[in-house]
Design a protein with these regions (language model features):
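Enrichment for repetitive, rod-forming helical segments
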Residues: 9-10, 43
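Bacterial N-terminal signal peptides that target proteins for export
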Residues: 1-9
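Sequence context surrounding c-type heme c attachment/ligation sites in exported
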Residues: 22-132
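Hydrophobic h-region of N-terminal signal peptides that target proteins for export
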Residues: 11-20
């Protein structure tokens, strides 16, 4: 489990380097991504310990972070779809916490993580295509 957390953290942090922005915009985006990573790690710890209150709290925080206007990295239909997938999975985490369903929370966490990986891949691909 710890290895998965470390891997997820490295992937998310690696994605930060592919994000564009200038000055305050880049700083704000980096801060939001770091908050997202911290909360995702806290959700994982809460799922592992059946701490449903913490699952709900940090999943709700992740939803709020994803809705912040500055969080919009790209204006593509695919990005919007991936962002919605992330919020849906985080919402499933909230519901699983309310239901005290650790299996549902575990699955929702994996789905949320996959949405992060897919989104970071999409952002890198779009950035590389624009750089060409």
């Amino acid at each position: 489990m710890r290895r998965f957390t470390l891997t997820a953290a490295l992937v998310l942090l690696a994605g930060l380097s592919g994000l564009s922005g200038h000055g305050a915009e880049k700083t704000k985006l980096t801060e939001l991504m770091q908050r997202k990573l911290v909360n995702a790690q806290k959700v994982l710890a809460a799922v592992a310990t059946n701490d449903f209150k913490a699952i709900r709290k940090h999943a709700e925080e992740l939803i709020d972070i994803s809705k912040e206007a500055e969080f919009k990295v790209l204006k593509t239909p695919r990005y919007e779809l991936l962002a919605e997938d992330f919020r849906r999975a985080a919402g499933e985490l909230v519901q699983s916490a309310k239901d005290r369903n650790v299996d549902g929370a575990s699955l929702a966490y994996v789905q949320m993580s996959l949405s992060c990986f897919k989104c970071h891949k999409h952002v890198r691909e779009v950035r590389m295509a624009r750089a060409d």
